[in-house]
Amino acid sequence: MPIVTVLRSLRKCAVVPSLLLFLLVAPRPIRAQVSGNSQPQSSPADTSKASTKPQTKNPSLRGPQAKQPAAGATLEADQQRQVGKIYYADGHVDVHYENTRLRADHVEYNEDTQVVLAHGNVQLDYLTQHVEAEDARYEVATGRGSFHHVRATFAVQRRQSPTLLISPNPIYFEAETADRINPDTYKVHKAWMTVCDPQKPTWKFYAPEATVYMRDSVHLENGNFRLFSVPVLYLPYATFPAEKQRASGFLIPDIGDSSSKGLILGDAFYWAPTDWADFTIGANYYSRRGWSQRADLRMRPWENARLDINYNGVVDRGLETSTGTINQGGHEAKLLFTALLPDGWRAVADLDNLSSLTYRIAFSETFVQAINSEVRNAAFLTKNFRGFSLNFAANSYKNYVSATPDTFVSLRTAPEARFSSVDQAPWEKLPIYFSFDAFTGASHREDTVTGFQTPNFVARTEFAPTVTIPFHFGPWLDVTPTFTFRTTYYGGQLQNGLYVGNGFFRTTEEFSLDLRPPTIERVWGDSTTGKRWKHVIEPEIIYTDVNGVKDFARFVRFDEDETLTDTNEIQYGVTQRLYFREGEGGTQELVSWSISEKYFFDPSFGGALVPGERNVFQTTDNLTPFAFLDQARHFSPIVSDIRVEPGRHFDTQFIVNLDPRHGQLTAIGELVKWKPYREYFLTVAHFSVVNLPTPVIDNPPNFDFEPRSNQVRTLIGYGDLTRRGFNSTFGVSYDLSRGSFQNQIAEVGYNGSCCGLGFEYRRFSFGSIRSENQYLVVFRIANLGSLGTLRRPEKIF
């Protein structure tokens, strides 16, 4: 190397040679530089630092690049000498080249080939790579090299994931030999690797041949997975991600046990052909039931576009009962597509295909999935422009009434085109706002409980212009009248409960008057601490009059539009809010409490109400989702909704319906979320609907207005399944009205820096369809995945 520095060992004992060297190289006090084709001007005995920056007389006549010294390389050592084109360095040898640093006890550097031969305590550092070896051959210019008896650490960056245990440790491996193909690729032989403590690794991979692609993946050939140094899984070929990149291959197998499914064994294959798409296909074997299939496709074909497809199915041999076997097999497929299209258009498709409710109850992995009796499908193309909205849509809704027998109510509106506008004022100085809503399409209804069914396409068209005129009387009163003229055409109707294809028009005049009295508020606080509170009281009064519906019984119930009735009513209520602010920080709403009630001047709703039956109208559903109309009445239940959110550690909501007619609470809903300390959490939900039959004289035989429901769900725990340390979760769902448990869950686990072990017990109890106990064990491997059936945190709510 042409650049040399004074030996550290000579700076103390060779004062005269040092002074002589200073005089010889005064322009560069501690360096001397020569061209790549000339001999150094100073004796090797008087030098200790070399550089490979050449001086050429004619840059255009340079020889082949591979034969030139590496530009910018420096070498430091306790002792150096040069023999021809080879530099010999001993003692604390330190070679620097760009972002690479090579250290060793002894180094031989060939100026022509730019090859370093290093022996003894070899260490290579490059960015996040650290390699230690007994000896090495390293090419300075290309970064290629060979190392023997290697120990190395590669730091990687992994994003936090709710389903994957992430280790802060680097990838560590030991190998007999390692070939550095380029700065980002290593080919290792007879190696083992882990992210655990290398002194006591809980797990490690061993492979005769392996390739490490930095910021990509690690490939193993004919390897095995070892737990406490004991081989437990043979891997003819395996890959796992080294950082953020994905790698195709077989996933870690599924293993579990279930009282109804028996022994569970399965696996899946993951394929990532591009950086914007991946596909997973897998299957599980159930020793008592049959086998299941699953497939997942994820695509991001262009910016602001997303496609997710999920399929799961079971080929079932049948559930054994005292009367024989019951086949509960089936499938469910879901598709979600969203995309922003040119010219301001947006496309969305959210589709769900379910073979039967029995299948969902019997084979759903979580309690929340199992109790969902609805199947929704929606697809639309929409564009918003200058206050207008144009939509083309197809929607369907299916609600299963029972699983055995399989009965349901199915509604469909497809195709449908809708054009609407927001409130717009055509005159700048007149506060008169116009809007409209118009649609045309076809509808269908099927009810397997009663056997009722309409033709596949029943025409339905509507046009509804609206005029709104707000008045502001200073800060004391806001009055907003709204007028709507709605005309709707139906291609069919009901006559004596049967469908007939006689079309008709429904024309209604709708008027509402929104009165907002002045808001009452009070602000107080402590000037010394900067804490301030604000209490606000917001009263509201809304009068509504609708007429023109007539003969409510002839409407086929396609959706909520057909629950519109004549009404003459007033709604009144008050909302209280408590705000808090500290210093210049943001304002937080601590408490909100809303109370409202309706008074019906026409208790028969234009003759729509049928005494002794459960009546659900648009006006009552806007107040509360709990039905209360069983006969004519003037007052609705009083609806109270309280929300308390005093910070990140506590959140609660309490909803009640107080029926003044019966003098009792008819519906109760409570939700409490509490994080009292650090990682502890508690969630409690309680929902209750009181069965209120009408007087016997008005009831049909065996009439039940609203089935009694009283359920409580609780979830308590510490931490989460991918958090380091001890974690636990316990949950229960209990039906108070039936006195039985529907679901129980208990999860306990511990995660270290490189792996974790978890145990889970699940209990599903859904009558004769499913009574199952599951015992699950999972071994989590940091940065890779998990071995077992507990793949992700389960949620009850």
Whereabouts are the PLM-identified features?
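Bacterial N-terminal signal peptides
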Residues: 14-26
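Compositionally biased, proline/threonine/alanine/serine-rich low-complexity intrinsically disordered stretches
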Residues: 30-71
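Gly/Ser-centered flexible loop/linker motifs
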Residues: 61, 66-71, 80-88, 258-264, ...
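N-terminal secretory signal peptides that target proteins for export/translocation
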Residues: 1-11
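Interaction modules related to DNA damage response and DNA replication/repair
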Residues: 58-77, 90-106, 119-133, 149-166, ...
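Structural recognition of beta-strand segments within beta-rich domains
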Residues: 74, 80-103, 108-119, 123-130, ...
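Outer-membrane beta-barrel proteins and related beta-barrel translocases across Gram-negative bacteria
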Residues: 129, 140-193, 198-209, 213-214, ...
